[in-house]
Amino acid sequence: MRYVAHGAADEFLYAVMIRACAESGEPEPERALDLFTEMTIDKQISPTTYTYNAVILTCARSKKFALEAFRLAREMLNSHRDAYGKTPSRLRPDNATYRALLEAAKRIGDLPRARWILAQMTSDAQTFQEGERPVYIDERVMTHFFHTYASYRPPFRRDAVSYVQKDEAEDQNFGPLDNASENRVEATDISYRPSVPQSRQEIIKEVTALWGRILEDRRDVMTDNQNHSSPYHLVFGHVSLTSTLLNAYMAVHYIHSPPSVAYKVYANLFEPLRLRRDAFTYVLALEAYAKGRRTSKEELRYALSVARNIWKDWRQLEDVGVSQMSTHPNSEGVDARVVERAWSAMMRLLTM
């Protein structure tokens, strides 16, 4: 009866319904996949990039279905190629596609896939042709990328390495492996280096270099400096410096840097760029020092002293935000949930 009273749903309507599954408070990937199957299989409606973006985003926002997002992306690229191996223009990935895939990568801490996506976006930006939707790296892309670094867990932990005493090693008989040292490949050989960071130090080194490149490209854009021989010059020229982007960069330091280094970055990051710290800046910092692992009383005292400094600035912002909440909702990013998180983090620190 419903289908008699109303016209048949078209591709755009299905895309809107699927996108709604991602925008709800709790993503509904199962319902989105059911709608996508109904559209493509039952109704024989050909999907477009917009439809794929909707279903990929819905799956990406659920950790359980994050890998399904990558499967759908492969289907989008491979199952509709023509005889020459080219994907039709209506199914070529755009910025929304890559952002959705990065959201899936950060959900599961999949840094190799995130790095591949960024490299692919860089390549697509260089090979952009007239009539195609442009692909470029902006601040939303880099926010997801930094969050992926924050959620990535390196395989190597120095404190987990077990050492063998020299005398014990000499007593052991390793048989055919005794001569292995003669054919050992030096660790400095670049061909044997891992493709992703293997320790927290390598993560911070890589992220710091990436952040420096963003600032360099932004500076060249502002000064209109085009004198550069690299084809990848200004690849980060579309990245706007926002508090959200800086918060994502700080999240990497909170997870992988020592507390003292993270606070030094926090204290010196915003003012030189003439950006204000928003509510999430303070909440993320307080939660980082409340949840961080501390192995000594000195580290606990340091975390508490840093948190007190952050708390003073937060209270000033909170007072302004709460006073304006009735007339300007979400003023300065302050809402009831953010206030709750800030107070919970500080109380947790004080009770340690």
What are these regions (language model features)?
Residues 1-352:
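A basic, Ser/Thr-enriched alpha-helical scaffold prevalent
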